[in-house]
Amino acid sequence: MLRYSNPGDWVLDQFMGSGTTLVEAKLLNRHAVGVDINPQSVSISETNLQFQCESKSKIFIRNGNATDLYFIKDSRIDFICTHPPYANIIKYSKGIEGDISLLAVDEFLSEMKKVAEESFRVLKNGKMCAVMIGDVRKYGKVIPLGFRMMECFLQAGFVNKEIIIKEQHNCRSTDYWETQNNNFLLLAHEYIFVFQK
């Protein structure tokens, strides 16, 4: 956020979860829009943002779908910083319509293409979009979800400026003994793709 935005800029996180991006935006004097399909995430984010600081940031939180940001006009956002769920790995709701965490990989990528198109629409020309995502393992095989999702953003019109590899410390997504029994290595990294419009 420090690298790709300035005080007073508008930041978007369309998979806001508990509101971490919005908290950072508030602390760094950026305005922010947070969107999540899960009403519980909206409530948690609202609670997490109830702190005082010197910032005069405007923070807007909305229960909605990242594939349809109709309430944001074209080319209004200065920076997108988001971390979508990983196709059917951790379910973030119990059947909320439009929750992409419930989808199989191909359906997930189809929805991420819509997310990429909406991101391109709302972002100002020349501005950056940072998306963090990792690969997944299904039935003992690695699915390169990160790079497949990257293609969605490239097809939407973005240019890839950076690929940052973020190491996951204390990775607990797969139990150590399970890796020993099934003879595979942990996926202990995520990607941060930085795209430019």
Which residues does each predicted region cover?
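Class I S-adenosyl-L-methionine-dependent methyltransferase catalytic core
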Residues: 1-197
